[in-house]
Amino acid sequence: MPVKVHGVILMNIEEWEEYRYVEAGIKESITLIEDPGLKKMVEHVCHSGGKRIRPIILLLVSEICSGSYSRSLNAALAVEMMHSASLIHDDLLDQGLVRRNLPSAPEKFGPSGALLCGDYLIAKSIAFISPYGEKVIQDFGKAGMDMAEGEVLDLKLEDESFGENDYFKCIYKKTASLFAISASIGAYTGGAEEELAERFSHFGNALGTAYQIVDDILEFLEVVEGKESKFTSETLPHIYMKSTSKEEALKKSIDCVKLHVAAAKETLETFRECPARDKLFQITDYITVDMLENL
């Protein structure tokens, strides 16, 4: 169904071929799980309404680089499995109760079950990424380590010295790093050389950063739907509020989103014009500025 934010219906990404391709791959991988209890947990986590943005980015980039979806699908599934595992661990750390309008994995299956489900998804992501060669595997592993380091940085949010520079380092590792490798690995699976893959990585980094700041803004304004946690991360508007008014902090945060969106689009403009590139432009707006339209 279409995603609705503040009463406004955004584009229906579920109608996209890339979305259906990823969904079919996830469904097939779940059918291969032998243990019924583990299968139930993975189904709950992986079929809870995610937009599949990261694997879709990977597939679209591979198409821009003249690759094929069949060649790139396992890499896309690896990215989605890693992302799903990170959400479980995030809910464990934040004592998340609700995610995407459903009970979180720890709430539904207990901390031990959720932890094991996350472990399985990480192992499955490694299995999916393993055929793609040394460079791709190294980059994928580095992103996983970055995400863990980002969570460690996030634990320091109660430290009064946690400022803007710490925040951007944290969200690069927690969020933007996976966007960056989704784009760069898509380039590699499409046959691109390292220089082109690096440019796609810059696009993913800028988009992932903008996406996280938008998420922070919505949380700051208490308009996030379908998510509930006992603890929350530090947000950019809250950091700015330490030295300015709420209104100015919000404006500075929105300006920061626009800056990173512009950087992402500027990089996109350098790639060959094609329907896949057009979709990346749509995604860029869809998960950033479109979410802020009615604030």
Swiss-Prot record:
Class of the enzyme per the UniProt entry, highest EC level: transferase
Keyword Magnesium applies: yes
Activity across pH: Optimum pH is 7.
Activity relative to temperature: Optimum temperature is 40 degrees Celsius.
Pfam families documented for this protein: polyprenyl_synt
Superkingdom in the source lineage: Archaea
EC number: 2.5.1.81
Annotated InterPro entries: GFPP_synthase-like (IPR053662), Isoprenoid_synthase_dom_sf (IPR008949), Polyprenyl_synt (IPR000092)
Alphabetical UniProt keywords: Magnesium, Metal-binding, Transferase
Annotated residues for binding of Mg(2+) 2: D90, D94
Cofactor: Mg(2+)
A GO molecular-function annotation: geranylfarnesyl diphosphate synthase activity
Record GO biological process: isoprenoid biosynthetic process
Function: Involved in biosynthesis of the polyprenyl side-chain of methanophenazine, an electron carrier utilized for methanogenesis. Catalyzes the condensation of isopentenyl pyrophosphate with the allylic pyrophosphates to yield geranylfarnesyl diphosphate (GFPP). It prefers geranylgeranyl diphosphate (GGPP) and farnesyl diphosphate (FPP) as allylic substrate.
Protein name: Geranylfarnesyl diphosphate synthase
Species this chain originates from: Methanosarcina mazei (strain ATCC BAA-159 / DSM 3647 / Goe1 / Go1 / JCM 11833 / OCM 88) (Methanosarcina frisia)
Lineage summary: Archaea, Methanobacteriati, Methanobacteriota, Stenosarchaea group, Methanomicrobia
